[in-house]
Amino acid sequence: MTQTPETALKRTPLHAAHLRAGARMVPFGGWDMPVQYSGLKAEHQAVRESAGVFDVSHMGEFRIQGEGALAFLQHVTPNDVSKLRPGRAQYNWLPNDRGGLVDDIYIYMVGENEYLMVVNASNIDKDWAHLQTLAAGFGVTLTNESDRWALLAVQGPKAAEVLQPHVDVDLGSKKKNAYFPARLFGFNVHLARTGYTGEDGFEVFIDASEAETVWDKLMAIGVTPAGLGARDTLRLEAGFPLYGHEFADDIHPLSSHYTWVVKDKPFYGREALQQPAQQKLIGLKLDKVPVREGYPVLQSGQVVGHVTSGTSSPTLGHPIALALVQAGAADATDFEVEVRGKAHPATRTDVPFYKAP
C-alpha cells in the first residue's frame, strides 16, 4: 500500500544510517523503525553479553518548568516526584480517571523547578493533550521538545566500558537512574543510566542534528546496532511491561507487578486505581511452541485470560509470555495456551524471567 501524505511514516534523524546498515524497516507507532540488522538473536546476545545501541528517537520529550512544576507532576502521577533531586530520574505513570493508564513514563529532574518527561512514541499527542488539560492553574510551562532530541540507548554489561574513553565524566561514579550532562565524542549530550533491556546501560539525549555522527562513531568502536525485535525480546525477558500490551487505557495497572509505583498521596485518577484489579499479570513458560499477543490462556479447559506478550527467549532457550488472567486464577501453577485451536501446557513462573548477573 502506498503511503499517502496523511499516513506517511515519520522518520528519526538516524533513518539514513539504518538504511546504510542494511536494517529491515517496519512501521511502529507511526514511525519507520529498524526491526533488525544482522539478526534478532545476534543483536539480543550482543546486549546480554557486551553492548548494543538502539535508536529510540521516536520517543517523546516534554519539558515542564515553573514554580508549580513539582506540584503539577505530583498531581498527574502516582509515584512521589518530591523524592527526586537534580540529576536523578524516576519511572512513573500517567493515570486516567477510569482505572487505566494514559501512558507509562520516565521523569528526569533537570534542576530546580525543571523536569524532562519521556513518553512512548505512539502516545505523544495523547499525552500532550492530557497534560495540557490538567496544567491549568499550576503555574507551569510545558514545552514539547520531541522534535529537538534524538535518543540513543547504549545497553549491555560493557556499555560503560565502551563509552568511558569517549566521555568527559567518570561513568563508574554514576548510579542507576542518574541523569547528567556530558561530552560524548566531543558533542554536548545528557546521559541517563536507564534502559529497557534488563542490563546496565546509558540513554543518550543529543541534538537531532548531531545524532547521526555520534551513531556512526558508536559503530566505529564496535557497538552492535540493535533493532526493535531485540528490544522486545530483551524487555520481555526482564519482565518490563510495554504500553499497548501490559498497560493500556483500559487495563488496571495494579494487575501488574509494578504496584510499588503507587505511593500514598493524592493524584489524578487515584480513586479509580483504588478499585481492586480484576486481573493479574503473570509470567508463563512453555516447552516448545512460541505464543503471541491475544492467544487464550486456559485453566482446566476454561478460558481465564490472554497472552499480552510472548516470544521464544534467546537467553533461556524456551518460549516465555506475560498474560493477564482472572485474579482468582492467578495463583495456580498449571495453565494452557491455545495456539491455532490446540492447547499447549504452560507453567506460571516468576517475573522477571531473566536477571542480569
UniProtKB/Swiss-Prot annotation:
GO terms for molecular function: aminomethyltransferase activity; transaminase activity. It catalyses: N(6)-[(R)-S(8)-aminomethyldihydrolipoyl]-L-lysyl-[protein] + (6S)-5,6,7,8-tetrahydrofolate = N(6)-[(R)-dihydrolipoyl]-L-lysyl-[protein] + (6R)-5,10-methylene-5,6,7,8-tetrahydrofolate + NH4(+). It comes from the Bacteria. GO terms for cellular component: cytosol; glycine cleavage complex. Signal peptide: none annotated. Coiled coil: none annotated. Its EC number is 2.1.2.10. GO terms for biological process: glycine decarboxylation via glycine cleavage system. HAMAP family: GcvT. The glycine cleavage system catalyzes the degradation of glycine. Belongs to the GcvT family. The glycine cleavage system is composed of four proteins: P, T, L and H. This is Aminomethyltransferase. It comes from Deinococcus deserti (strain DSM 17065 / CIP 109153 / LMG 22923 / VCD115). The lineage of its organism: Bacteria, Thermotogati, Deinococcota, Deinococci, Deinococcales. The gene is gcvT.
